């Protein structure tokens, strides 16, 4: 990114603190976001790893992940996930942002931490509701709720993986998601 700054116009920005604050906010969000859109880094996971019966297919086209399947609680199951293992070296990220649309259902963002011995039963989560129109979501790490036993502390440099999940009840999954990033 190249930024040309005309010093003669700097005075205008200093006289308009709201403009300056807005520009700094936009610049900081774009400069420090960690994009997580590489389809090669994501994988589908279902409760079949523990004997469940849920099914999931993942497709990626034109920068959009498509999750389609069925969550069923049969045989003590009940989840499908689009999951990405990550390795962050600093603690500067405050949350996850993405755009999603789907079949007017509730989905969850799951964060699993390093050092947790019992995934997928121990994680942090936040629910979000989708509609048939694209919506932008920003979920702060501070707003995540602990599920299960959590020995590790929530810091962005302590994240093991991030998942978008259909969870906990019988329903059809039909979700499109894009522009996934840490902010």
Summary of predicted features, one role per range:
Residues 1-18:
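N-terminal secretory signal peptides that target proteins for export/translocation
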Residues 32-183:
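Beta-rich carbohydrate-recognition modules and glycan-binding surfaces
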């Amino acid at each position: 990114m190249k930024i040309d700054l005309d010093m003669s116009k700097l005075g205008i920005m200093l006289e308009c603190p709201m403009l300056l604050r807005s520009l700094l906010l936009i610049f900081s969000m774009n400069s420090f976001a960690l994009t997580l859109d590489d389809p090669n880094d994501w994988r589908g996971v279902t409760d079949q790893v523990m004997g469940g019966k849920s099914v999931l297919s993942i497709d990626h086209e034109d920068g959009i992940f498509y999750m389609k399947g069925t969550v069923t609680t049969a045989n003590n199951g009940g989840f499908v996930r689009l999951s990405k293992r990550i390795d962050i070296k600093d603690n500067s990220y405050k949350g996850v942002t993405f755009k999603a649309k789907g079949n007017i259902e509730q989905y969850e963002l799951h964060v699993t931490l390093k050092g947790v011995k019992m995934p997928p039963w121990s994680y942090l989560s936040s629910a979000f509701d989708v509609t048939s129109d694209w919506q932008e979501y920003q979920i702060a790490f501070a707003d995540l709720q602990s599920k299960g036993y959590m020995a590790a502390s929530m810091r962005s440099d302590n994240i093991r993986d991030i998942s978008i999940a259909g969870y906990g009840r019988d329903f059809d999954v039909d979700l499109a998601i894009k522009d996934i990033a840490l902010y």
